[in-house]
Amino acid sequence: MLLIPAIDLKDGQCVRLKQGDMDQATIFSEDPAAMARKWVDLGARRLHLVDLNGAFAGKPKNLEAIEAILDEVGDEIPVQLGGGIRSLETIEKYLDAGLSYVIIGTAAVKDPGFLQDACTAFAGSIIVGLDAKDGKVATDGWSKLTGHEVIDLAQKFEDYGVESIVYTDIGRDGMLQGINIEATVKLAQAVGIPVIASGGLSNLVDIENLCEVEEQGVEGVICGRAIYSGDLDFAAAQKRADELNGELDNA
């Protein structure tokens, strides 16, 4: 089970939002590269970056901070990024800079042809971010709820060749209310590609519950507010996940 720390970038700083509201941003660090180093030193095996300004602007807005993070840890672990990815040129720029994966969200829903082109051009590097509330997909920084069913879209995107899906329950994100395990497993069972859970992770019990369903296709979980607020000890949580999955050498 991959525990993936999230570094949400707004105006070059590391912040956390409540339910995607840019006006409810808590600044946790003014040095995102140092924050990336901290999580890697604590045992992170992948990082999840979000360009929040980019998500709302539709183009990269935190390049300097992203490049600083990649300079710091990009040679050590895979780094994925979402937010504002609307063109093949942007994807190419990010992958050339050292990102392992880019996450396409709104554009995948609104312009499936773009997603198909991206999967063809950058096979193995494209993750789709599906944000949902009550099973319906949301777009545009969660501000618009569509009529699309999550599972229908996920199956279509799997056919396009996406590498995995980051599934966010937007009713829970940033609220420390617990992961929506049921909805995440339902999605994972409906597709043959890995699903990464997101939204609401609050404590060690969530990690233990996720480890129980890893074999259903839930590859990892994005760790946000809980690891910044101190509700979840990241290093201890990754160790516990490894113990549960038999990934620690007992010798």
From Swiss-Prot:
GO BP term, example: L-histidine biosynthetic process
Where are the disulfide bridges? none
| GO cellular component term, pick one | cytoplasm
**What EC class is this?**
isomerase
The EC number(s) attached to this protein equal: 5.3.1.16
Q: Which domain of life is it from?
A: Bacteria
Active site per UniProt: D8 (proton acceptor), D131 (proton donor)
> What Gene Ontology terms describe what this protein does at the molecular function level?
1-(5-phosphoribosyl)-5-[(5-phosphoribosylamino)methylideneamino]imidazole-4-carboxamide isomerase activity
The pathway this protein participates in, as annotated, is: Amino-acid biosynthesis; L-histidine biosynthesis; L-histidine from 5-phospho-alpha-D-ribose 1-diphosphate: step 4/9
Primary localization class, coarse: cytoplasm
What keywords were assigned to this record?
Amino-acid biosynthesis, Cytoplasm, Histidine biosynthesis, Isomerase
InterPro entries in UniProt: Aldolase_TIM, His_biosynth, HisA_bact_arch, Isoase_HisA-like, Isoase_HisA-like_bact, RibuloseP-bd_barrel
Sorted alphabetically, which Pfam families does this protein's record hold? His_biosynth (PF00977)
Subcellular localization, as worded in the UniProt entry = Cytoplasm
Q: Describe the reaction catalysed, as an equation.
A: 1-(5-phospho-beta-D-ribosyl)-5-[(5-phospho-beta-D-ribosylamino)methylideneamino]imidazole-4-carboxamide = 5-[(5-phospho-1-deoxy-D-ribulos-1-ylimino)methylamino]-1-(5-phospho-beta-D-ribosyl)imidazole-4-carboxamide
Q: Which Gene3D superfamilies match?
A: Aldolase class I
Family assignment from sequence similarity:
Belongs to the HisA/HisF family.
What PANTHER family does UniProt report for this protein, alphabetically?
1-(5-PHOSPHORIBOSYL)-5-[(5-PHOSPHORIBOSYLAMINO)METHYLIDENEAMINO] IMIDAZOLE-4-CARBOXAMIDE ISOMERASE
Q: What is this protein called?
A: 1-(5-phosphoribosyl)-5-[(5-phosphoribosylamino)methylideneamino] imidazole-4-carboxamide isomerase
**Per the UniProt entry, what species is this protein from, by scientific name?**
Burkholderia lata (strain ATCC 17760 / DSM 23089 / LMG 22485 / NCIMB 9086 / R18194 / 383)
Q: Source organism lineage?
A: Bacteria, Pseudomonadati, Pseudomonadota, Betaproteobacteria, Burkholderiales
Q: Which gene encodes it?
A: hisA
